[in-house]
Amino acid sequence: MDSKRSLLFMALLFISFLIYQQWQVDYNTPKPEVTEQAQVSEVNSTALTATSDIANDTQAKGRVITLENDVFRLKVNTLGGDVIGSELLNYDAELHSSAPFVLLQNNADKVYIAQSGLVGKNGIDSRAGRANYQVEGDVFKLAEGQQELKVPLIFEKDGVIYRKVFVLKPGSYALEVNFEITNQSPKPIELVPYAQLTHTLVESSGSMAMPTYTGGAYSSSETNYKKYSFEDMEKADLDIHTKAGWVALLQHYFVSAWIPNQDANNTLYTLTNTKKHLGSIGYRSAPIVIENGATETIHTQLWTGPKLQDQMADVANHLDLTVDYGWAWFIAKPLFKLLTLIQSLVQNWGLAIIGVTLVVKAVLYPLTKAQYTSMAKMRMLQPKLQEMRERFGEDRQRMSQEMMKLYKEEKVNPLGGCLPILLQMPIFIALYWTFMEAVELRHAPFFGWVQDLSAQDPYFILPILMGASMFLLQKMSPTPVADPMQQKVMTFMPLIFMVFFLFFPAGLVLYWLASNLITIAQQWLIYRGLEKKGLHTRVKK
């Protein structure tokens, strides 16, 4: 296999990967699993309170207050204490926009809110009505140097004082939402905490070049991470009993997640309202009995922000898996750490991509050298192989036996040119997902005209350069392709790939371009060594 065939093989593998990926998105939606049962202690029937009791009014009319730290600004409705809006202050809505990115919102075009409350026998957040909390003030902002901001919302009913306390910390997208309940009534009360994320039902968007997922996900004691799409929600309600865990709604680069008390028994659930075109994913905990004169505190957290892996891993187990690298995660994670390390040194994500490419190509150089050496040896055997074809003609069995004998005598592996490529493909796929999933590349500039590595090149310069580098790689091939049809395919391959990559993120095209240029340099170096060994002769074209 000469280098032209290697290039074709690599291209076909890559295209096959993209087609398979898109097919998975479009047609291979798995049947929802709704009966996962974790090992939890027995809970009484009240713990399984029907989710139909949970309030799902997204248009509750209450006073709206603002909570803010240095990374986000939240809108909270005092009727129920739901978070109905979030602005991410360090992320622009669009490139070069002065407006912050809006994640949670509640308007005529889109509903995406984080609800929480107390249901059960003595619940205050049923469909019959929500708790109307009182709070002094409208705007609460974490001051510079302040380590924590607590904002208590207070509601009293039948001798019970309910305090819903929001806790903000500097630099954190994790919001603590704690219930402090003091029972001053003469009887014990029973409550079931719940929290859910409600979103307008939508389909995952994107393209073959940049697929994106918008939908639910969850983690339980038996499943570290699993997606549960809006389509799944419409087919069957999720109903998983587990200890710990979390529920989330994902979109490209951003996530909102409710994390309950990790020591409690919880039921993860979904709800859909087809009339209002809404879907919810949430959890409800085991019932809590509060005796008269007692006070109980219920802890929960809401993450609403970018997919920052290190921070999310500190908030909850496996929450960082929402940065979904697919099956290549074990390669992608260290590659991402390498990418961030290089970026911290060079202070440019484009240069960091080139740096990662250099490191990867250096690590793979022994495989690359073995590939070209094997191909060179195969070329040296071509006259003998052609002679065998002519001698044995239709006797394919004899010809195969003689060929294998020749390979053994010459110590040549006929698959030596393919195997290194197959071994490199998982690394390329891991890099692909690393660049696709990293929110750090969103609106990250390289230089000049490339101001957003997560978007396509606005002037298509990088794809054109990438196509030219592929053409140059072809021209460096030591032998022409004999088959006319294959020759035509190879002639148009750089053009096909150039058109294909017009719609890819600039960061991924930059990686491919850098990889091609490094391959050209490595190929030149390897061929020089092979010439000295008499295994390669330059062909004038």
Curated annotation (Swiss-Prot):
One of its GO terms (biological process) is protein transport. It is found in: Cell inner membrane. InterPro entries: Membr_insert_YidC, Membr_insert_YidC_N, YidC/ALB3/OXA1/COX18, YidC/Oxa/ALB_C, YidC_ALB_C, YidC_periplasmic_sf. Pfam families: 60KD_IMP (PF02096), YidC_periplas (PF14849). Signal peptide: none annotated. Keywords: Cell inner membrane, Cell membrane, Chaperone, Membrane, Protein transport, Transmembrane, Transmembrane helix, Transport. Its main location: membrane. The chain crosses the membrane at residues 7-27, 345-365, 415-435, 453-473, 492-512. It comes from the Bacteria. GO terms for cellular component: plasma membrane. It is a multi-pass membrane protein. GO terms for molecular function: membrane insertase activity. Interacts with the Sec translocase complex via SecD. Specifically interacts with transmembrane segments of nascent integral membrane proteins during membrane integration. Required for the insertion and/or proper folding and/or complex formation of integral membrane proteins into the membrane. Involved in integration of membrane proteins that insert both dependently and independently of the Sec translocase complex, as well as at least some lipoproteins. Aids folding of multispanning membrane proteins. Belongs to the OXA1/ALB3/YidC family. Type 1 subfamily. This is Membrane protein insertase YidC. It comes from Histophilus somni (strain 2336). The gene is yidC.
